[in-house]
Amino acid sequence: VRIENSFIPVQGVGEATEQKLWSNGITHWDEFDGSVVGPTRADRIETFIADAWPHLDDGDASFFDRNLPSGERWRLYENFRPETCFFDIETTGLDHHRDRVTTVSFHRDGETTTLVQGEDLTADTLARQFEDAKLLVTFNGKRFDVPFLETSFGVDLDMPHVDLMYPCKQLGYSGGLKSIEGELGVERDEPDITGKDAVRLWREYERGDESALDTLVSYNRDDAVNLQSLMETVQDKLHQDVFETAREQ
């Protein structure tokens, strides 16, 4: 589902109305026919479409983020795929006021970068990684990764954000990232380690074991890279469930 297939950002248009439009063959803004929904709702939709096209042409993801229901932000991905930043952090614990961020890995446009505490992980290097990103993708990042980075480094991550934990729940998948990857058939290059292992590896690195850092970084990079595979799998499943099912009715 692309943004221009979506009518749900319009105030007063819910799932039922959007699916009614789709099932009547109106699957794109350019195909809109107000007779399917009645004059009042048709006026709202036509006004929204006229307003929305310039925002889409300008690559303004924030406009659609503000108008989409929170559970539908996954629809942003197809339009903003090249400017999507997948990222994951490792820390010394769970308290973003007391514990430290140890590594942060970013996956953008096929390239993966890792920043390490004490080497190149600073507020400036973080800001550069997020620069020009139109969409963030994480797993449990709204409750964990984002608060940690904002508290620890003072970076502003107030931008469109798909936290994959929520669309996974929408599809009936619960649990942690690794268990959901397993259920969906998303494979990893490296053996799986736990969050506790990540803390232990950092402690070993601080005591002088460079190989422990190599293992931690490899694990962290896998997390970031696999977020793209998970995003695309989730998007495909939701596209089928939400869009194709309605079109077939």
Tell what function each PLM region has.
Residues 28, 122, 144-145, 223-226:
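Short phosphate-engaging motifs
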Residues 66-135:
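Conserved RNase H-like, two-metal-ion catalytic cores of nucleic-acid enzymes
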